[in-house]
Structures are given as structure tokens and as C-alpha cells.
């Protein structure tokens, strides 16, 4: 069975949200259970969910630490402290290949829907 992968997401171009060129200083670092195709592996997540972490970074906010969670078919980022914000669902995350150059959409805790680029995916 394949282990965890460190995936770094960086804010992609989001002109309607005020980021016409994206922002490499805004994103997420995820320890994710990926299969050989680069997709999330729910069975591996169940075995290693305590190690499946998320860290949100932003130039104007404190970092937020939490976990990658699965509820039904929906993957989301869950934060354990109120000041870090509510859970953030990720649109069809289970269907995406998390490989460099791919894009995913995150509904952030403030309701903004933003596109992020997979900048890095390294087995750990």
C-alpha cells in the first residue's frame, strides 16, 4: 500500500476575488493518502487519518492547522480551534488527481470559493 504524500496548494489565478495573478504565499500544505493515480485513497485515510493534516497559510492571517476529513463522499479541511475558522469543503476533491499543475476549488470558511494550483506532491 502506498503511504502519505505532502501536497502543496498555492492560490491560482482568481481575478474576480482580487487575485489576477494568484499568490504563492497563500495556500495549503496537506499530508494526503494518495493512490498510484494521485487520487485520495479513502481506505488508506481510514488507517492513517491522524497523520492526514492540513495547514493553511496566508500572508495576512495566522496559519491554521487541522485535518483532512471525509464525510460520505465529501473531503474537507477541518480545523479544531474556533479562531481558525469553520470546516472548508473541497469541490470534488476525491475525483481530482493531486499532481503538480492540476487545479482544485476550495470553499473557504468565509464563503469565498477559490481555485488553487497543485504546486508540489512528494511522497513522505
Over which residues does each language-model region extend?
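Short beta-strand/loop turn elements enriched in aromatics
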Residues: 49-89
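A structural detector for beta-sheet-dominated domains
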Residues: 10-12, 31-35, 71, 78-80, ...
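N-terminal intrinsically disordered, low-complexity, charge/repeat-rich segments that act as generic
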Residues: 1-46, 58
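Broad, structure-driven detector of short, well-ordered beta-strand segments within folded domains
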Residues: 28-32, 64-70, 116
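Ordered hydrophobic segments in well-structured contexts
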Residues: 6-8, 27-31, 76, 103-105, ...
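A short, compositionally biased
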Residues: 2-3, 70-73, 98-102
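Short, compact, well-ordered microdomains
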Residues: 78-124
Amino acid at each position: 500500500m502506498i503511504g502519505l504524500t505532502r501536497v502543496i496548494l498555492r492560490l491560482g489565478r482568481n481575478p474576480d476575488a482580487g487575485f489576477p495573478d494568484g499568490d504563492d504565499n497563500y495556500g495549503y500544505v496537506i499530508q494526503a493518502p494518495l493512490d498510484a493515480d494521485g487520487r485520495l485513497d479513502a481506505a488508506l485515510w481510514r488507517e492513517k487519518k491522524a497523520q492526514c493534516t492540513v495547514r493553511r497559510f496566508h500572508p495576512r492571517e495566522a496559519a491554521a492547522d487541522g485535518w483532512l476529513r471525509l464525510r460520505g463522499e465529501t473531503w474537507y479541511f477541518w480545523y479544531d480551534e474556533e479562531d481558525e475558522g469553520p470546516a472548508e469543503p473541497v469541490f470534488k476533491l476525491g475525483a481530482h488527481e493531486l499532481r503538480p499543475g492540476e487545479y482544485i476549488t476550495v470553499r473557504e470558511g468565509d464563503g469565498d470559493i477559490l481555485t488553487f494550483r497543485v504546486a508540489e506532491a512528494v511522497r513522505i
